[in-house]
């Protein structure tokens, strides 16, 4: 099933199409090269096809673009989760990226919460401010109503640190979204909102 959302503010114009069942190559153009790279990795490792086109005020900096993409992706994920008939709910994954190690644990709980425990080795990767990684995930997690714990266990090269986090999140989400074969909501309450 395909989901699409367009969002326009005075800072960004975002158009994202997301498909959980389409293994075609994604097309990602955010205007922020490093973010394009991370979202391409996220798409590949989660199995979620993304078509992203963004016009943002990157002449100011990359903050609005990065945060707003996280918000829209979270909103699209929430729509997809509500439509799923069966899913595992929980996912956890470790990713080693050479010298770095990241762990991400995700619960499709309906209770939005992000624990972000990562201190990056440097403040920038190229022109990308590393503090924006947390802003991206906060926007995504809160809007998708996930409970997610992100931990950078071992650091090293800053690019590797961030890449390990994006890949671990993608894999944990893929597990949480996977069909567990049961019918109904994976909660003893009978509902996840």
Swiss-Prot record:
Record's CDD domains? IGPD
Concerning PROSITE patterns, the annotation shows: IGP_DEHYDRATASE_1, IGP_DEHYDRATASE_2
Q: Does the keyword Protein biosynthesis apply?
A: no
Q: Which GO terms describe its cellular component?
A: cytoplasm
Question: Which reaction(s) does its UniProt entry say it catalyses?
Answer: D-erythro-1-(imidazol-4-yl)glycerol 3-phosphate = 3-(imidazol-4-yl)-2-oxopropyl phosphate + H2O
Q: What class of enzyme is it?
A: lyase
One GO biological process term is:
L-histidine biosynthetic process
Q: Which domain of life is it from?
A: Bacteria
Keywords associated with the record: Amino-acid biosynthesis, Cytoplasm, Histidine biosynthesis, Lyase
Q: What is its main location?
A: cytoplasm
What's its EC?
A: 4.2.1.19
Picking any one GO molecular function of the record gives: imidazoleglycerol-phosphate dehydratase activity
Q: Which InterPro entries match?
A: IGPD_sf, ImidazoleglycerolP_deHydtase, ImidazoleglycerP_deHydtase_CS, Ribosomal_Su5_D2-typ_SF
Q: Which family does it belong to?
A: Belongs to the imidazoleglycerol-phosphate dehydratase family.
Checking PANTHER family in the record gives:
IMIDAZOLEGLYCEROL-PHOSPHATE DEHYDRATASE (PTHR23133:SF2), IMIDAZOLEGLYCEROL-PHOSPHATE DEHYDRATASE HIS7 (PTHR23133)
Name used for this protein in its record: Imidazoleglycerol-phosphate dehydratase
